[in-house]
UniProtKB/Swiss-Prot annotation:
Residues 93-194 form the Thioredoxin domain. This is Thioredoxin-like 1-2, chloroplastic. GO terms for cellular component: chloroplast. Probable thiol-disulfide oxidoreductase that may participate in various redox reactions. It comes from Arabidopsis thaliana (Mouse-ear cress).
Length: 245
């Protein structure tokens, strides 16, 4: 098994890292911490609505959790938290290719992360906030643990890592970013996310990226990828699969 080692707030990839696990132990209540339930009856707790009701005293008011468009369900793992409208979890190389080609003229941000990467965990809430304040930008999340071969084919060797794509321009920039260098991400978002009219269809992945994914067997031809391959001179799947970098 390979491992992801943490250097500062970046995670350098040499393959897979096991998920970190925390030991859990039951805590004991001290006698002075106990409650006299006869004197202070407890009202029922509505965990479905995330509302905690304290003692049944008329002066006590329940605490209501704040709501937003960012998914923060109880028990949800940190990398599963996302906006409801413009953040999508990529499931395969074909899913990635199709999502980029179907984005039209929208700016698309590929967010490469790993559940075991501390830098990714620290940065993720900021990315969710930026996604919420930039609804016209599409954020595609790529889990390196589940799509390791694809990430290697896309030359992603450090996390967190981002690639920006825009319409007919294709890839416009790529870089590693941490919570300490979040301004780099914000500047790229402002620069490439401004309103513009792109002439031509969305380009998506470039030729080298497509070739790399095909060479490791990650990419299977469908109508969209076949159309993209024909634009660079490959008319059959056999020709595309044998494309040399």
């Amino acid at each position: 098994m390979d491992a992801i080692s943490s250097l500062g707030t970046n995670c350098v990839l040499s393959g897979v890292s096991p998920f970190s696990q925390e030991n859990q132990s039951k805590s004991k209540l001290s006698p002075f911490m106990s409650l006299d339930l006869k004197e202070h009856p407890m009202a029922s707790a509505d965990f479905t609505n995330q509302t905690l009701t304290a003692f049944s005293s008329s002066s006590a008011s329940p605490f209501q959790a704040k709501t937003s468009s960012i998914g923060m369900s109880r028990g949800m793992r940190w990398w599963e938290k996302s906006t409801n409208h413009n953040m999508l979890e990529i499931q395969s190389a074909n899913h990635l290719v199709d999502s980029l080609l179907n984005a039209g003229d929208r700016l698309v941000v590929l967010d490469f992360y790993s559940p075991g990467c501390g830098g990714c965990k620290s940065l993720h809430p900021k990315i969710c906030q930026l996604a919420e304040t930039n609804p016209n930008v599409m954020f595609l999340k790529v889990n390196q643990e589940e799509l390791r071969t694809m990430c290697h084919g896309l030359n992603v060797h450090v996390l967190p890592f981002f690639k920006f794509y825009r319409g007919a321009e294709g890839k416009v920039c790529s870089f590693s970013c941490t919570i300490a260098t979040i301004n780099k991400f914000k500047k790229a978002l402002d620069k490439h996310g401004s309103e513009r009219c792109s002439l031509g269809d969305a380009k998506g992945l470039d030729e080298k990226e497509l070739a790399a994914l095909a060479s490791v067997g990650e990419l299977k031809m469908n109508s969209l990828t076949m159309h993209q391959a024909s634009n660079i001179g490959y008319k059959t799947e056999e020709q595309y699969q044998t494309m040399v970098l």
